[in-house]
Amino acid sequence: METNNKLKILKTGTTTVGIKVKDGVVLAADRRASAGMYVAHKYVRKVLYVAPNIGITTAGSVADLQFIYDLLKNIYHYNLITGMRPITIKALATYLANMLSFSKYLPYIVQILIGGVDEQPRLYNLDYVGDITEEDYTATGSGSVEAIGVIEDEYRPDMTLDEAADLARRAIFSSIKRDPYTGTGVIVSKITKNGHEEKEYYPQRKI
């Protein structure tokens, strides 16, 4: 009963997108934070970085997401200090999946994409019970139905990173038009082995 109540109380909306191509990974998300029908904040950052070449997108309970983000950063830096080499993206995603699975009876209410480039581009989708899948493209959150439709219609494995970034932007803007929990603007991040480049986009207001 406690878990069911937690799920109901913390049900929030958002849209996040991940696209993997040969040159890197694109992560994107809208900027609105909602609690039920209430817009809690208009300018929330949902694309975060564990390292310059590793990013995550966040959806779910803000407190749970903050804890997990800090944990992932600590794991990455601890591995640098003790192992003298960066942890792989696959290992980082697997660690988080195991932690979420162990906590499934008192779960962290999160939906997380982990993406980046080490030996090759990687994109993982994780839910709150620890299910993990490696994807070429994916979308999460309340606006994911609209976003994934746009991506599936236009995605190609041979897309450039710039083309993937534009596709992610348009996918989330399609969700902003239809999903009341998705809004304000879009952050789009292009991640390569050498780091990331980020841009923000906002809808043009009609006069």
UniProtKB/Swiss-Prot annotation:
E.C. designation(s):
3.4.25.1
SUPFAM superfamilies reported in the protein's UniProt record:
N-terminal nucleophile aminohydrolases (Ntn hydrolases)
Keyword Transport on entry: no
Q: Which GO terms describe its molecular function?
A: threonine-type endopeptidase activity
Task: Name the InterPro entries on file.
Answer: Ntn_hydrolases_N (IPR029055), Pept_T1A_Psome_bsu_arc (IPR019983), Pept_T1A_subB (IPR000243), Proteasome_bsu_CS (IPR016050), Proteasome_sua/b (IPR001353), Proteasome_suB-type (IPR023333)
Compartments annotated for it: namely: Cytoplasm
* Gene Ontology BP annotations: proteasomal protein catabolic process
Family membership: Belongs to the peptidase T1B family.
Record's protein name = Proteasome subunit beta 2
